[in-house]
Amino acid sequence: MRSLIDRLTAAHIGRTTNFYRDGAGAALRRERLAAYLEARSEAPLLLVGEAPGYRGARVSGIPFTSERQLTGSGPAEATATIVQRVLTELGLTDQVLLWNVVPTHPGTDRSNRAPTRAEVAAGRRFADELARGRRVLAVGRIAANALGAPYIRHPSHGGVAEFREGLLRFAPGGRSVRPFSV
């Protein structure tokens, strides 16, 4: 995994921000990502989203994870909160490796934007590498179209129930428990 992180750190993906290379805290984000990838090295499922959010992985270094989830302080991120909660409820946390088809952040430090086709194409190689030996599920249409993987509805904008149902449909060993409300 170290070579993947080294290549990711060196990557220039369109007009995205490579927060593993640039800015205060880049070394900490790389360290966190390395620890996360090691901890999930045997996860049979790869859940791939579109791109890091400005309040999520851009700050924490871990896909679908906010700084608040790691440290108890800092910004929370709605999608990260929902994804982590649903994975916990379904007993899938350790079974899933989270990633984004564009692993660097499109947008500014205060906003997100959709990645361009070129950015998706350039970032996909990292998802392809992590997909080896794993079942791949795509969160959202951009990831599904890029990877040709089964689509799961993104949990934002009222999609929590459909996101949850998609995980139960495709994930091995998921269990249905009482849903939470957002």
Regions of interest found by a model, annotated:
Residues 1-146, 150-151, 157-158:
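A polyanion-binding, active-site-adjacent surface
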